[in-house]
UniProtKB/Swiss-Prot annotation:
Heme 1 (or BL or b562) is low-potential and absorbs at about 562 nm, and heme 2 (or BH or b566) is high-potential and absorbs at about 566 nm. InterPro entries: Cyt_b/b6_C, Cyt_b/b6_C_sf, Cyt_b/b6_N, Cytb/b6-like_sf, Cytochrome_b, Cytochrome_b_C_euk/bac, Cytochrome_b_N_euk/bac, Di-haem_cyt_TM. Belongs to the cytochrome b family. Component of the ubiquinol-cytochrome c reductase complex (complex III or cytochrome b-c1 complex) that is part of the mitochondrial respiratory chain. The b-c1 complex mediates electron transfer from ubiquinol to cytochrome c. Contributes to the generation of a proton gradient across the mitochondrial membrane that is then used for ATP synthesis. It is a multi-pass membrane protein. This is Cytochrome b. Heme b b562 binds at H84, H183. It comes from Vireo olivaceus. It holds the Pfam family Cytochrome_B. Keywords: Electron transport, Heme, Iron, Membrane, Metal-binding, Mitochondrion, Mitochondrion inner membrane, Respiratory chain, Transmembrane, Transmembrane helix, Transport, Ubiquinone. GO terms for molecular function: metal ion binding; ubiquinol-cytochrome-c reductase activity. PROSITE patterns: CYTB_CTER, CYTB_NTER. Binds 2 heme b groups non-covalently. A ubiquinone binds at H202.
Length: 380
């Protein structure tokens, strides 16, 4: 009998075990689609980014013009740029929903998978930040200036560190050149980390909505979930194309249509929408170092999730107290996102401070307490 190549070839065997014969819980919902959607986002971003890089010039005197040239003179350059810029937004929508799913269903108890995932989020944020600087518009320049300046809050080495990152005494040509190099490199780092993420995931297998072991009831990934994933791809790519074609500048900042000018500060410096919640937390503390620490903590707190899990149940499916807290946390992050886009004046300052306080309180204090209470109520 001839060997089945798919199951015996050294390379095809890896693909087979990851995408075809992978034993998968029979009851995972649409919330489990976002991992594969993130993979599609990454591929889309690398392809469109590569095409854009072919027409881009990483020089302060030419960057803005080269982007305008891409949009005006390159065949479908406008479409490639719009897909790339809005693709970043979809990437973040998917990753935030993916993390929300992980929090709700207790997926963070796969500790290695979760920790690699948080590192992936940090790498994605770094990639998006350096990419936003490349068109060299007003918000690109001032965003780069403000955010890199935060490192100067680090005691003793801060100022040296910032000047080392800038390659000079202000954001200038060396900064743009190195940001382009980093923006080209980091997506491939993300691709590598994604493989590590999947390797750890396939050690334990997927979690499921009930949060109980599903070894007794697994089904093959293909055709069941491959078809389900293709539906997700179609819906997401249709949404991305619709946004890129009908309203490409909806999520961008009009300030970025003005070339960078170090002598004129925009009235409101703010990052893209996907960083606004962290930006609001940064601004809510009236101290530079304190703000920077809070900003870092807002993401790094995710590393603590496995340690803060006190419930005897994995998922929140049967835990109403934790469910209420979870949805309050979601609302809270949306409020922070809104506050981050507003000017620094009352009542936005106090709302931002209260929202920042409740963000950390819910995660660090109320979630663990709710878990203990639910155990007691159920006599677990």
């Amino acid at each position: 009998m001839a060997l089945n190549l798919r199951k015996n070839h050294p390379l095809l065997k890896i693909v087979n075990d990851s995408l075809i014969d992978l034993p998968t819980p029979s009851n995972i919902s649409t919330w489990w689609n976002f991992g594969s959607l993130l993979g599609i986002c990454l591929v889309t971003q690398i392809v469109t980014g590569l095409l854009l890089a072919m027409h881009y010039t990483a020089d302060t005197s030419l960057a803005f013009t080269s982007v305008a040239h891409t949009c005006r003179n390159v065949q479908f350059g406008w479409l490639i740029r719009n897909l790339h810029a809005n693709g970043a937004s979809f990437f973040f929508i998917c990753i935030y929903l993916h993390i929300g799913r992980g929090l709700y269903y207790g997926s963070y108890l796969n500790k290695e998978t979760w920790n690699v995932g948080v590192i992936l989020l940090l790498t994605l944020m770094a990639t998006a930040f350096v990419g936003y600087v490349l068109p060299w518009g007003q918000m690109s320049f001032w965003g780069a200036t403000v955010i890199t300046n935060l490192f100067s809050a680090i005691p003793y080495i801060g100022q040296t560190l910032v000047e080392w990152a800038w390659g000079g005494f202000s954001v200038d040509n060396p900064t743009l050149t190195r940001f382009f190099a980093l923006h080209f490199l980091l997506p491939f780092v993300i691709a590598g980390l994604t493989l590590v993420h999947l390797t750890f995931l396939h050690e334990t297998g997927s979690n499921n909505p009930l949060g109980i072991p599903s070894d007794c009831d697994k089904i093959p990934f293909h055709p069941y979930y491959s078809i389900k994933d293709i539906l997700g791809f179609a819906l997401m790519l249709a949404s991305l194309v619709a946004l890129a074609l009908f309203s490409p500048n909806l999520l961008g900042d009009p300030e970025n249509f003005t070339p960078a000018n170090p002598l004129a500060t925009p009235p409101h410096i703010k990052p893209e929408w996907y960083f606004l919640f962290a930006y609001a937390i940064l601004r809510s503390i009236p101290n530079k170092l304190g703000g920077v620490l809070a900003l870092a903590a807002s993401i790094l707190v995710l590393f603590l999730m496995p340690l803060l899990h006190t419930s005897k149940q994995r998922s929140m499916t049967f835990r109403p107290l934790s469910q209420i807290l979870f949805w309050v946390l979601v609302t809270n992050v949306l409020i922070l996102t809104w506050i981050g886009s507003q000017p620094v004046e009352q009542p936005f300052i106090i709302i931002g401070q209260l929202a920042s306080l409740s963000y950390f309180t819910i995660i660090l204090v109320l979630f663990p307490i709710a878990g203990v209470l639910e155990n007691k109520m159920l006599k677990l």
